[in-house]
Amino acid sequence: MTARHFLLDTDLTSSEQAALLDLADQLKATRRDRKPARRPLEGRSVALIFEKPSTRTRLSFDVAVAELGGHPIVIDSGSSQLGRGETIEDTAAVLSRYVDAIVIRTFAQDRVDRMAAAATVPVINALSDHTHPCQALADLQTIREIRGRLAGVTLAYLGDGNNVAHSLLLAGALAGLRVHVASPPGYEPIEQVVRHANEIGAVTGGEALVTHDALEAAAGADVLYTDVWASMGQDTESDSRALVFQPYRLDEKVVEAASPDAIVMHCLPAHREMEISAAVLDGPRSVVFDQAENRLHAQKALLSFLLDETTAGVGSR
């Protein structure tokens, strides 16, 4: 049987995505109420490969695997042969003999794809330079539990058209969201991603729009979202990016342009008074810590979806 991977947001269908979010809600409620939970990963091991530093992704996956009954094995590239030149293909082949799934957080999407091509167990993209699909699942769960729905909701993303923006566009399209991205010229999301999102949206009712005007994107939005201006590996560009992205800061003026009950999201870590004002990040509309918590529940649902035979067919193609 061929392993099912989660490399891009679009590796799920709309119905699979909805079923996975339903499962995430159920798992969250079970944990909150301290009820006995199923342990579908009992006796299984999951390798967690981190080639980039991580707090939320590492901890949430570690806890997720453990709470599902499995054994998480964290592998830092600096302390393994992977960081000393062993090929990603050889690593995938060996790990497939030891573990039941591989989670990888790395720099290039190509490394995720190559890992999956050589592995015989499920591979999960925990972040690449192209997408951040696990983050988007948690974001959708957060929006749905607060707004009560996803279809027809307008999300305004301000800032760099990066991996988070790409995943919001693609996952949002599957869910029927209207995703409006405001980025400076030259920092927009990849055109192919925007086009693909609109192709999906033509079926689901979603929409992908890119503008250079932050207030235009935010006008009437139900969700306001931002991310850091300089991602890991772009440290030398921090000062120049700060100047370019200043008009895209999520501040009180942007909040006023949005819907009166708009929520504020940030995938964290945040730099107060840079991409977002402290008043907005710490204000009553902010749901950033609910969003961070939902990484755990969404990833438990994803692991169950890929590895638990009792849920594998839910919402299937």
UniProtKB/Swiss-Prot annotation:
Primary localization: cytoplasm
Keyword Lipid metabolism: no
Protein residues bound to L-ornithine: N163, D227, S231, M232
EC number(s) stated in the UniProt entry for this protein: 2.1.3.3
GO MF entries: amino acid binding; ornithine carbamoyltransferase activity
Localization in the cell: Cytoplasm
Pfam family, any one: OTCace
Function of the molecule: Reversibly catalyzes the transfer of the carbamoyl group from carbamoyl phosphate (CP) to the N(epsilon) atom of ornithine (ORN) to produce L-citrulline.
Biological process according to GO: arginine biosynthetic process via ornithine; citrulline biosynthetic process; L-arginine biosynthetic process
Catalytic activity: carbamoyl phosphate + L-ornithine = L-citrulline + phosphate + H(+)
Pathway: Amino-acid biosynthesis; L-arginine biosynthesis; L-arginine from L-ornithine and carbamoyl phosphate: step 1/3
Tagged with keyword Cytoplasm: yes
Gene giving rise to this polypeptide: argF
SUPFAM superfamilies: Aspartate/ornithine carbamoyltransferase (SSF53671)
Cystine bridges: none
Protein name according to UniProt: Ornithine carbamoyltransferase
Gene Ontology cellular component list: cytoplasm
List of residues binding carbamoyl phosphate: S54, T55, R56, T57, Q81, R105, H132, P133, C134, Q135, C267, L268, R295
Similarity remark: Belongs to the aspartate/ornithine carbamoyltransferase superfamily. OTCase family.
Keywords annotated in UniProt: Amino-acid biosynthesis, Arginine biosynthesis, Cytoplasm, Transferase
